[in-house]
């Protein structure tokens, strides 16, 4: 992603020296294959200075003076688009929220509905969740080929920073329990959010999450009721045909979660686990690196949004 110029980072809770160390050494991904160091005002990555800010009010950030075009809002505090618009007040042109959002102009899942993005009217964009990015490409293929009547999903998801490392208080009593010691059932809006990118599936999908004691890689276990009878072979053939190898991938290898660490696809269908019951009930398993896969789509979306904004501006000027 050399086409993207990284201008600044705003994090009130992180100092440059801490950021440089965490960037350089990752417990899951290993050591960064490049150079990173801190300086007084930020960090230097591969010789490029990236300035740091610690501003709690995004509207006060110097985005206009710095020529910032696209802000990736990843704090988790500004998932309401009305609050995220503070970045636009500060001078940015577009905001991408790296989470499910409310009041956003559009939710985009690459490989599913990115063609609906209109730079003239979509200024605050949600990227949904990593789980929605895994499920939606699968649902798109299955619905187009066979028709989805309804479905239930379980995401078997690696634990996240919103869980407690040891038993401690949390508004969700299950997430209050030690994440590395328990299977933790919890809610997810990922299934329902598919309807934001595939409107024909509104009200047809639901599900929940099972957080498990692994640091990275998750899977979606989804059961669809279809509008026609199918076989395992037909379902796998449709998924194999629909897999572009970039967003949606297909495998017949008997792999486990650690094999998917560092994979950049949003969704990798495990064809060996596809099942059909009663003709029109199908179970599909698809893996995803919930860190690398989502981060890759986020960078690609940032590039797409920036490029289309620039093209739209040039067209307007001409």
Specify the residue positions occupied by each region the protein language model found.
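Active-site-lining helix/loop region of Rossmann-like oxidoreductase modules
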Residues: 4-5, 16-17, 31, 137-242
